[in-house]
Amino acid sequence: MKGEFLTARDIQKILGVKQAKSYDIIRTLNAQMKEEGYMVIQGKVSRAKFEECYCYKGPKSQTG
């Protein structure tokens, strides 16, 4: 999961959703990006767009 793009499997692991839901998320985010004028890759979504929309920043530290 270190690349610029996330797959349905990556989204399943991050959000704990089923495969169908993860593909729905990808379709929704890619549609938004198309409206903004970006080129998209079917079946993958920009990690930056996903993090922007889902406020996901990875595991939080247990210290502090």
Swiss-Prot record:
Q: What gene name is listed for this protein?
A: xis
In the record, what lineage is assigned to the organism producing the protein?
A: Bacteria, Bacillati, Bacillota, Bacilli, Bacillales
> Which keywords are on file for this protein?
DNA integration, DNA recombination, DNA-binding
Q: Which domain of life is it from?
A: Bacteria
| MF terms in GO | DNA binding
Inducing stimuli? Constitutively expressed at very low levels. Induced in response to overproduction of RapI or treatment with DNA-damaging agent mitomycin C (MMC).
Q: Which GO terms describe its biological process?
A: DNA integration; DNA recombination
- Origin organism of this chain? Bacillus subtilis (strain 168)
Q: List the protein's name.
A: ICEBs1 excisionase
Job of this protein:
Required for the excision of the integrative and conjugative element ICEBs1. Excision of ICEBs1 requires two sites, attL and attR, at the left and right ends of the integrated ICEBs1.
